[in-house]
Amino acid sequence: CGIKFTSDEPSALPELSERYESSVPGLYVVGALAGYPLIKLAMNQGYEVVETISGNEIPPADEPLLEEKFAALPGRKVNDLLREIQENVPLLSHMSALQFREFMIDSVIHLKKAGDVIFERNEYTNSVFSIVEGRVNVQINPEDENEVVELKKGSFFGEMGLIAGRRRTATVVAKRECFLVETPRRAMLKLISSVPGAKKVLDTAAIYRQIQTHLAPNIEKELLKEIVDSATIESLSAGDKLISEGDESDLSLIHI
């Protein structure tokens, strides 16, 4: 019927507006087919669709949840904040309006002051942080807290816990006042499995950071582009053969 989906994956959801309208004008999708299997959610969505078709302006059912989520930012409308976050953070820009509203309900808003510790090295946490406003310092040397990498607006951090399931590899401190979005691992995994553009942004950033950390700490990011574009992230199980004695190869491998 011409409905577009977010990816070619069998589990991909249809692209929908915040009013559940598909890419086919006038065709709406609610409930399990839209990624919401609970009957109560489907009923709320159906009500919104009927009111929309009737020409009545009503707030989305999730509006109170998002208003509560953004309570620390008084005087700013939900839609304006959602738009600002997606515009400022490339990782989050590939979601549809409906996907992003659900994503933000699962996430937590943090407002940090300069000097606040966001998380510490070796913590057993695996959420991902996105920087909507402000800057943070990543302390990459446990022996010298002044050896840092600065991350600016639009960046994200904490992805190694997501990709490799490891403890935090660095301490991160707010350099100035920050507006951060913290997203749990489950929501991030759902994002990268259903939105190919987000997975590409995440993988590319992870490769850049691993190369800069382990191979080329003093080389500008732009000079590494050709190397990063040719690199891939591979997952191996116990017992899988990585290389064999006598292999002829010009590859470099980084264990993350």
Where are these regions (language model features)?
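Short, glycine/charged-enriched secondary-structure capping and boundary segments
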Residues: 1-3, 43-44, 196-197
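FAD-site-proximal beta/loop scaffold in flavoenzymes
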Residues: 1-37
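Gly/Ser/Thr-rich helix-start
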Residues: 3, 27, 32, 36, ...
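Short secondary-structure boundary/hinge segments and terminal tails
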Residues: 15-16, 46, 191
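Short secondary-structure transition/capping segments
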Residues: 18-20, 41, 193
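Conserved mid-domain beta->alpha element of the FAD-binding
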Residues: 37-51
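Cytosolic regulatory regions built on CNB/CRP/Popeye-like sensor folds
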Residues: 50-256
